[in-house]
């Protein structure tokens, strides 16, 4: 382990929820895969506000490392008041997998991680975009940026994981990732989402609210319709 110290909720209808539950049940768990494979996973983070950096193996031989998680809990504290919480370790798996999926090797820049209730209330007074019961308050979310790939690619890769929430903020150049319910904002168009999930098996909903798995069969199309 290496540490340096230089100084909305999206509503869904009941039918969509049932569909989501069914699809989640058939999506392989990368956590289980990591345990089965005996993975060792290292996460490299840099905090935008404290200017601290950390490189730590949060998984060793497939299991979470308690000492590493404790260090990450402090690193990802509410930087405004140093309040800490127990971060959900599944979040580190999501970030590790998303970064690996896009081929990024740069440290993950953390814009926001844990938020104490006091901080969340303060931010809600400033912006309507801050959820009252934010996943940040539960230690289940991070807002991140990586310098060597576009945030659009991080967004797409994280959405494919279907492991929680994905919020895309291109104007602020970061992506929100959490391990709450599977959802994404802003929603993609039907065509955009279909390119990510050509088989239609996704919990995500497009802007028209119509689940891809419910779309009508179409006539056979030429192979490889720019679906990369």
Where in this protein do the model-derived segments appear?
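Bacterial N-terminal signal peptides that target proteins for export
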Residues: 3-17
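Bacterial N-terminal signal peptides
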Residues: 14-26
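Boundary at the C-terminal end of the N-terminal hydrophobic targeting segment
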Residues: 29-38
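Catalytic cores and adjacent binding grooves of peptidoglycan-active enzymes
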Residues: 41-46, 130-228
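Loop/turn elements at helix/coil->beta-strand transitions in domains of secreted/extracellular proteins
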Residues: 52, 104-108, 162-165, 173
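Short, surface-exposed glycine/acidic/tryptophan-bearing loops
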Residues: 59, 63, 114-141
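Active-site acidic/histidine clusters and adjacent loop/turn architecture
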Residues: 60-111
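Extended, low-complexity, intrinsically disordered C-terminal regulatory tails
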Residues: 97-125, 227-228
């Amino acid at each position: 382990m290496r540490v340096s110290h230089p100084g909305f909720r999206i509503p869904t209808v009941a039918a969509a929820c049932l569909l989501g539950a069914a699809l989640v049940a058939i999506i392989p768990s990368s956590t289980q895969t990591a345990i089965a494979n005996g993975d060792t996973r290292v996460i490299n983070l840099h905090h935008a506000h404290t200017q601290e950096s950390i490189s730590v193996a949060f998984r060793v031989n497939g299991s979470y490392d308690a000492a590493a998680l404790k260090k990450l809990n402090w690193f990802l504290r509410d930087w405004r008041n140093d309040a800490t919480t127990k971060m959900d370790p599944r979040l580190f798996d999501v970030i590790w997998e998303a970064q690996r999926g896009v081929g990024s090797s740069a440290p993950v820049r953390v814009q926001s991680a844990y938020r104490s209730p006091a901080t969340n209330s303060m931010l809600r007074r400033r912006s309507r975009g801050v959820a009252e019961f934010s996943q940040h308050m539960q230690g289940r979310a991070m807002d991140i940026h990586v310098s060597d790939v576009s945030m659009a690619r991080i967004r797409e890769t994280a959405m494919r994981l279907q492991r929680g929430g994905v919020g895309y903020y291109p104007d602020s150049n970061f992506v929100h990732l959490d391990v709450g319910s599977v959802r994404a904002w802003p929603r993609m168009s039907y065509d955009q989402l279909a390119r990510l999930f050509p088989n239609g098996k996704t919990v995500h909903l497009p802007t028209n609210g119509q689940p891809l798995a419910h779309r009508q069969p179409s006539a056979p199309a030429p192979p490889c319709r720019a679906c990369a």
